């Protein structure tokens, strides 16, 4: 059996899990097929508190009410069934990956909902001497290392309170980093030169979007995506092993928006460009792990890319994200204990927005215990908060406190 999991997030899962994972390897003529996956489910209990009103509803915060809710749901990772294949032909390493990603949450009798994503469908070809090319759909390039180093990748994080019926929760998405998301792309990845590597790619341009998550102000949006241009993404990293092991990385994205519409749906208000960059580092020594991350953007928005990134006049908003995380793996038992804190802030524009800034933050304490080499028990406590700092109206605040208990299985 192979020691790797045939998923885009495999490196993070292998690093985060304290046990070995194995796929199911099948020789098939010139090909070697690898079948792997993840199954997880969690009981969650969320208590809400804070102010009611516009802008306090996202991130599983209810609406600032004093209610509580219990759910049984998938965590940050959806369930996965992934089939990968690889072969060597004409001096090229050729491969593919296709995955299906169902959730476990149900919220109504006689209605199962979509509960299905298809996050991966890509092919690769290349050689270790010059790198590889990927065509298809996979995890985005910008901000990918932020989520792959998040300890809640094995758990729940935020969003359990109001995302029941969804395929996944949010983890630390929106409370420390932007979502890398799953994107159609053409990407080149370099060879690994003694720990250094990079990836650059063209990814499908998306529209600027608007939501009810931004209080008291509508937002501009677009319907023509990037026009004649794709989005451009890239990242570079350096990784080392030894008694003190670690990794440092940097990534960026830029995309043009064609014919942005203002809040009255008048098209062609402006053309603009969103840009964002991030950097991070993680270090592991003697069972201790420390991760630090910071990102900044203009027009990138909040939580998911390009959401609420432009005000009602079509002017881009600034935003930044950061988180710190510490973990310790108990010798012998293999139990990983962790604590992390992070913030995401969207700045209002003085000419258009009634708010100065919107700050989403979260504390997480987690324990991740391997009871077999493939099965982990997970316990988490998270405290998620949204602070809306207004220019004239009273400020608003909402909280959600969530306890999560469950298990995640790798095969």
Q: Model segments located where?
A:
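Gram-negative bacterial Sec-dependent N-terminal signal peptides
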Residues: 1-23
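Outer membrane beta-barrel
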Residues: 24-46, 68-208, 228-230, 238-240
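Transmembrane beta-barrel strands of outer-membrane/channel proteins
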Residues: 37-45, 96-100, 137, 200-204, ...
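Gram-negative outer-membrane beta-barrel proteins
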Residues: 43-51, 102-108, 141-145, 206-210, ...
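Outer-membrane beta-barrel architecture
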Residues: 82-84, 122-125, 187-189, 235-237, ...
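Repeated loop/turn-to-beta-strand initiation elements of outer-membrane beta-barrel proteins
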Residues: 91-94, 129-133, 195-198, 242-250, ...
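Detector for outer-membrane/organellar transmembrane beta-barrel domains
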Residues: 227-365
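Outer-membrane beta-barrel "beta-signal"
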Residues: 398-411
């Amino acid at each position: 059996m192979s020691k790797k999991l045939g998923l885009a997030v495999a490196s993070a899962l292998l690093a985060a899990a304290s046990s070995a994972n194995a796929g199911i390897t099948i020789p098939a003529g010139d090909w070697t097929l690898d079948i792997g996956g993840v199954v997880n489910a969690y009981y969650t209990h969320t208590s809400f508190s804070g102010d009611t009103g516009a802008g306090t509803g996202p991130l599983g915060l209810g609406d600032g009410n004093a209610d509580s809710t219990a759910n049984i749901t998938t965590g940050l990772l959806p369930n996965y069934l992934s089939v990968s294949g690889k072969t060597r032909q004409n001096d090229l390493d050729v491969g593919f990956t296709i995955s299906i990603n169902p959730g476990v949450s149900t919220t109504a009798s006689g209605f199962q909902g979509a509960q299905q994503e298809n996050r991966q469908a890509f092919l690769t070809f290349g050689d270790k001497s010059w790198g590889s090319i990927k065509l298809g759909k996979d995890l985005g390039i910008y901000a990918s290392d932020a989520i792959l180093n998040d300890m809640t990748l094995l758990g729940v994080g935020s969003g359990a309170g109001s995302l029941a019926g969804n395929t996944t929760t949010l983890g630390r998405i929106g409370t420390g980093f932007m979502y890398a998301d799953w994107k159609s792309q053409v990407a080149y990845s370099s060879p690994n030169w003694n720990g250094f590597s990079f990836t650059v790619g063209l990814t499908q341009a998306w529209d600027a979007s608007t939501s009810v998550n931004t209080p008291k102000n509508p937002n501009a949006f677009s319907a023509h995506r990037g026009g004649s241009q794709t989005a451009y993404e890239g990242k570079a990293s350096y990784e080392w092993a030894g008694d003190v092991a670690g990794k440092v990385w940097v990534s960026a994205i830029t995309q043009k928006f064609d014919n942005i519409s203002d809040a009255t749906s008048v098209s062609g208000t402006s053309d603009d460009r969103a840009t964002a960059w991030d950097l991070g580092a993680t270090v592991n020594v003697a069972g201790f792990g420390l991760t630090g991350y910071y990102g900044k953007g203009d027009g990138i928005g909040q939580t998911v890319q390009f959401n609420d990134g432009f005000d009602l006049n079509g002017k881009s908003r600034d935003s930044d994200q950061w988180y710190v995380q510490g973990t310790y793996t108990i010798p012998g038992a293999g139990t990983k204990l962790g604590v992390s804190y992070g913030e995401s802030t969207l700045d209002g524009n003085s000419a258009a927005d009634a708010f100065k800034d919107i700050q989403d933050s979260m504390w997480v304490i987690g324990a991740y215990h391997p009871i077999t080499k493939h099965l982990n028990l997970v316990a988490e406590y998270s405290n998620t908060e949204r602070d809306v700092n207004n220019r004239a109206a009273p400020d608003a605040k909402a909280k959600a406190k969530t306890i999560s208990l469950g298990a995640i299985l790798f095969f």
